[in-house]
């Protein structure tokens, strides 16, 4: 989902609530939220901290991608087992939504230690992907939208995808009844569930990927 949509919608809150100041931060974890370094956080997993309230917002599903440059200069990837011969670009293990599991309907494939793995944060992974360093497994399609639409980056192994991760909007339990906090969380959740042009299903349809191969677990 395109985060700019949320930023634009939330900008109206200070107009409605004079004196309210908004600040957007990256990479706020559970502890930072508990410590008051942020009041609301978006997580790609369900937090277990008892001091937090987590409201589900559906799932995000990425698909495997590589740059057109990489695909032209390397052996064709015909089946998931061929990934052993290609560097894998993925988010590092410090990311709470980290997963090494690829899925295709009822089939699973693990990116194990025998694979060559290039770890990084989202920016580093995007850079490695565009530079043609390997196959990325957990890039948010909205983060590489321009490259997907102009063909610089292309899907690999249609139907295979990283294990879906559950999206949650969270706040401290102590502030969960604050009307402004509730209003902001409601705006974010509504947009997350109704921004059809930017959800994972829309990307699958746009790129002619088999949506039926994605089996979502219950939140």
Which residues does each PLM region occupy?
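A local structural motif
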Residues: 17-25, 107-116
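Secondary-structure junction motif
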Residues: 86-108
């Amino acid at each position: 989902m395109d985060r700019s949509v949320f930023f634009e919608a939330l900008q109206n809150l200070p107009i409605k609530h004079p004196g309210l100041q908004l600040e957007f931060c990256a990479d706020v974890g559970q502890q930072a939220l508990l410590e008051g370094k942020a009041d609301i956080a978006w997580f790609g997993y369900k937090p277990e901290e008892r001091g937090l309230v987590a409201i589900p917002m559906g799932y995000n599903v990425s698909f495997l991608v590589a740059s057109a440059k990489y695909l032209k200069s390397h052996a064709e990837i015909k089946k998931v087992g061929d990934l052993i011969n290609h560097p894998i670009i993925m988010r590092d293990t410090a990311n709470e939504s980290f997963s090494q599991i690829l899925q295709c309907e009822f089939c699973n494939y693990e990116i194990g230690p025998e694979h060559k793995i290039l770890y990084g944060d989202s920016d580093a992974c995007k850079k490695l992907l565009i530079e043609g360093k390997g196959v990325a497994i957990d890039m948010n399609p909205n983060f590489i939208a321009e490259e997907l639409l102009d063909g610089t980056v292309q899907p690999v192994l249609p139907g295979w995808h990283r294990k879906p991760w559950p999206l949650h909007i969270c706040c401290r339990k102590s502030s969960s009844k604050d009307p402004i906090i509730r209003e902001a969380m409601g705006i974010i959740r509504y947009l997350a569930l109704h921004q059809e042009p930017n959800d994972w299903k829309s990307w699958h349809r746009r790129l002619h990927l088999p949506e039926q191969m994605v089996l979502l677990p219950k939140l």
